[in-house]
């Protein structure tokens, strides 16, 4: 369907008019599946504006699987009656969304004593393997609500961390942010040819502004400001910044042992 015009929240009546046909035609769209007219109507005007930003991409893009994004960390609490249903549906083992995630980097109980050997599946040639995590900093809005200044501020905030990684692993920062604003040059800026080369090598992400799902959610706004990646000297360790999460931290390697990739990420 065509994208809805303007950024102003729909009335509860119009929301129902737009979502009812999607619910019928696209039952796997979790956003519209759990959008409730009475709940939406009961929100304050201010909360309704934010909630509309959270759910708009699922209405603009009926074939979405999730179709919604929190705009700031607190949205998961503010709009818990909605998000708990969506998240519970996605994580089938926790339909009521009552469990709390606990980080566990111990892989010793997985596979054969922590060894995950893909050659045991009969594979003869080495595979390109990747393990990654997404991270967002609570001091910032989530990507859908960040403006250009905040995206640039986030990039600058990360520079010290990238410098520390470069000292340990070598490498470089590859930024497509044209400038830092107020006449401040970006010392890590790369030209279009270098950017395309990194995309072709699967090291950098593609133009987000061409993605209708991210565009509708506000996640691709201000492209290409605040976007880029840090890459180690051997090109195996990569951190994207400014994509669908503020940070996507990954390790890539050719071989058979996935546990080795996981250990390097850890």
Cite the ranges covered by each PLM segment.
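Long, Pro/Ser/Thr-rich low-complexity/intrinsically disordered regulatory tracts in eukaryotic proteins
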Residues: 2-266
